[in-house]
Regions:
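Conserved aromatic anchor
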Residues: 673-683
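Surface-exposed, short loops/turns at beta-strand junctions within beta-sandwich domains
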Residues: 725-733
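Juxtamembrane regions of bacterial inner-membrane/periplasmic proteins
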Residues: 1-286, 290, 313-314
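Conserved catalytic neighborhood of penicillin-recognizing serine enzymes
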Residues: 89-113, 235-239, 356-418, 434, ...
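Bacterial peptidoglycan biogenesis and beta-lactam-recognition machinery
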Residues: 53, 63-76, 89-94, 130-136, ...
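A penicillin-recognizing enzyme superfamily signal
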Residues: 271-292, 304-305, 316, 323-334, ...
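Short pre-catalytic segments that frame enzyme active sites
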Residues: 28, 33-46, 157, 161, ...
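Extracellular fibronectin type III
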Residues: 744-755
Length: 757
């Protein structure tokens, strides 16, 4: 199993042995303190040949997973086309149509992320494999390398575990159960969820009837066997695999970097494993932690923890019930759309790098469209909040501002530079650009390890470090040492990241959505959450609540460690709670996990040094472009802001020129003049939130009336549409009406009229 094994398919001949290579020496693994943590003395599992498989098992497998297996060439074209049509119409990839050959490829070489790209990869490799191996050999590979119980490879493992008998002795109802649980072994675990397992077994039996492998009577008889009575309840404790989620990452990286398989090439393996953290995570994976509890059996979890000092992976949450070797590792192999966790990394990191923003920058949340389209950018609440500080925009996760910011960045540096940036932090999942990237709507997605490493770049003042779990290997055959260096590269300038970190720290201190609950005492945390929503068609088709969402991320860091955690579901299922809704605590496990890891590993009372290139100066709050205050500006409208030295503002605020002209009428009566103004002149302004307004600085804009006679001028403030002004003289007078700020000096254009008595 694994990359090195599958590679043999393409370079060697049909006669290559598929049983594990035996060697008198075995590999050993060491933690970050050079203590041995395990030896790779692989458990001997009886290899199952095709001839060992009973007909009832083969029939159940093919009727359920691949009914045309013996007639296609690795690709079931009708099912593929049907699935693609369904997925495109629903704008999702929930529908699958993998043949057995494709499933084998997916589980031994590719990620299990449901994308069209992966489907095409499966199709290509499946077609190639079917030219090398016979149909019976492919089934043989499948049943020996797929984890039927979700833990150990091979159907024989599952058969011995559940029935205490080898696969060749299983009965029809036993075979149907084994086939039924393989696609969701955790949920359909017959020991933990016998009701769901029974329902699934019966579905398999019905499929066998549908495809004429059973009579209706035979199926009903098989359904009559209670699952609880079929199972073998052993007193033998199931084998434990300590630290396995982390170790599987180590094995994958060794294969990727050297092409060597630690299970077949004996070696000493030195890692960055933090056993204290990983032991805590192991308890969480088994749902045995007093800090973290899961209540939904279908809910999954994944996380990666990185040491910021050297960029190493020090612990990983590979998935719930992660107990076995070389399982699908959600911390390393799974990719999901990063949602709003991308905002600090993309729009705002590039804004501070290229747009020279201050940490007190003001932005506007208003109606926004994706560039060159008529598609509106919606916030999660479908509302707009007006002007706000940048820390509020991140805290409230305003989508409009993230998209507008990215658009401004693209306007300055171009789309190609944005793609280069994403590639430099290993978050580029396609070579095409899309403004929806600003919201984390990637074509495929990122893994928790990828996201943690990217956030680690912010923790490391702009230096990206390629995440490694393996430090060094020593081959036992010749004592050859192979060391692996974590590559470091500056991506963003130190001062840009310092300003962004200042914003994130301010955002955390304001405790948006109770985000500050993840912070241990005396530890400065910067973090961002993210949620992915369902397409409207999926909500309708699956009868989910309108406010249901797919998953939740939490990514963040203190000075010494970075964490990226995800929770969600492997598969979207009808009539099952494979979704979250607001105010439901199930998704909050990312916060609980984050806080617990920080409690254990975060160093207290650490902060970032302020670069010499950063200066702090007072500006008029909310001004954009930035304005320096004069002595007349009230201190309530002044805020200290940090800037790069080469982008300090130089323009002082000054009273604006008033250009509005006021139309009015008047009529005379005894001893007074009545001035008539438009009814809407005194209407209240829009209530849209504004941080900066000249009326806050210079007072309200007032309507002034001057009545002049000879060398005497009387001034009145008009405050309604009808204004009566007494006159003490009956001669020719001049009347002027104009705007003026209450505390200002400038006046608007005069509208002079002559009063003749």
């Amino acid at each position: 199993m694994g990359v090195s094994y599958i590679s043999n398919i393409f370079v060697n001949t049909k006669g290559v042995s598929i049983t594990p290579f035996n060697n008198k020496h075995v590999s050993s693994v060491y933690d970050n303190q050079n203590n041995i943590v395990t030896k790779l003395d692989k458990e001997k599992t009886p290899y199952v040949s095709y001839e060992d498989l009973p007909d009832v098992f083969i029939d159940a497998l093919l009727c359920t997973e691949d009914v045309r297996f013996f007639t296609h060439n690795g690709i079931d074209i009708p099912r593929i086309l049907s699935a693609i049509k369904t997925n495109l119409s629903s704008n999702s990839y929930a529908q699958g149509a993998s043949t057995l050959t494709q499933q084998f490829i997916k589980n031994t070489m590719l990620t299990s992320n449901k994308t069209l790209k992966r489907k095409f990869e499966e199709m290509y490799l499946a077609h190639k494999i079917e030219k090398i191996y016979s149909k019976k050999e492919i089934i043989e590979l499948y049943v020996n390398y797929i984890c039927f119980d979700g833990i150990n490879p091979g159907v024989n493992h599952a058969s011995l575990k559940y029935y205490n008998k080898p696969i060749n002795l299983v009965t029809l109802p036993e075979a149907a159960l084994l086939v039924g649980i393989v696609n969701l072994p955790t949920y359909y675990n017959p020991f933990k969820n016998p009701v769901a397992a029974t329902k699934r077994r019966n579905e398999v039996l019905d499929l066998m009837v549908k495809h004429n492998r059973l009579s209706h009577y035979q199926a009903e008889v098989a359904k009559s066997f209670p699952i609880e009575k079929m199972l073998y309840k052993s007193n033998k404790q199931e084998k434990e695999y300590p630290f396995q989620a982390y170790l599987d990452i180590v094995y994958s990286q060794i294969e990727d970097l050297t092409g060597l398989d630690p299970f077949t090439t004996p070696m000493k393996i030195y890692t960055y494993l933090d056993t204290t953290l990983q032991a805590e995570i192991d308890l969480m994976q088994k749902n045995n932690s007093s800090y973290l509890k899961f209540t939904n059996d279908l809910q999954q979890f994944a996380a990666s923890i990185i040491n910021n000092e050297n960029g190493s992976i020090i612990a990983a949450f590979g998935g719930r019930n992660y107990n076995g070797q070389r399982l699908f590792n959600r911390a390393y192999d799974m990719v999901k759309q990063p949602a709003s966790t991308i905002k600090p990394l993309l729009s705002y990191a590039l804004a501070y790098e290229h747009l020279n923003w201050s940490d007190k920058h003001t932005v506007l949340d208003d109606t926004t469209y994706y560039p060159n389209t008529n598609q509106e950018v919606n916030n999660v609440d479908f509302k707009h909040m007006g002007e706000m500080m940048i820390d509020e925009a991140i805290g409230y996760s305003r989508n409009t501002i993230a998209v507008k910011t990215l658009q401004e960045v693209v306007g300055l540096i171009g789309k190609d530079k944005v793609l280069e940036y994403l590639k430099s932090i290993n978050l580029l999942d396609t070579n095409s650009f899309n403004y929806s990237y600003a919201l984390g709507a990637f074509e495929y997605g990122v893994s928790p390890t990828q996201l943690a490493a990217a956030y680690g770049m912010l923790a490391n003042q702009g230096i990206y470090k390629t995440p490694l779990a393996v430090k060094e290997i020593v081959l036992l055959e010749n004592n050859k040492k192979i060391s692996f260096t974590i590559q470091s590269k500056r991506i963003l300038n130190n001062d840009s990241v310092y300003l962004l970190n200042s914003v994130l720290e301010s955002m955390m201190s304001k405790n948006f959505w109770n985000i500050n609950s993840i912070c241990p005492k005396n530890v400065q945390i910067s973090a961002k959450t993210g949620t992915s929503s369902f397409d409207e068609k999926v909500l309708t088709d699956f009868n989910y609540p309108k406010n249901a969402y797919k998953d939740r991320w939490l990514a963040g860091y203190c000075k010494n460690i970075t964490i990226a955690a995800w929770t969600g579901f492997d598969t979207t299922l009808k009539e099952q709670k494979t979704y979250f809704i607001p105010n439901n605590t199930d998704a909050n496990v990312v916060k609980t996990f984050f806080k617990r890891i920080m409690d254990i590993a975060a160093k207290k009372n650490q902060s970032y040094d302020k670069p010499d290139s950063i200066v702090t100066i007072p500006i008029v709050k909310g001004s954009n472009p930035y304005l320096l205050p004069t002595q007349s500006v009230n201190k309530n409208y002044i805020i200290n802001a940090q800037f790069k030295k080469d982008s300090i503002p130089s323009l002082y605020i000054c009273e604006p020129t008033i250009t509005q002209f006021i139309e009015y009428d008047y009529f005379l009566s005894k001893d007074k003049v009545t001035i008539l103004l438009a009814n809407d002149l005194f209407d209240k302004k829009e209530t849209t939130n504004k941080i900066f307004d000249y009326e806050k600085i210079y007072g309200n804009l007032e309507v002034i009336c001057e009545i002049s006679h000879d060398y005497t001028t009387s001034t009145f403030i008009l405050d309604s549409s009808i204004n009566e002004i007494p006159l003490s003289y009956k001669q020719i007078s001049t009347i002027n009406v104009y705007y003026k700020y209450k505390n200002g000096h400038n006046t608007g254009p005069f509208n002079n009229k002559i009063i003749i008595y």
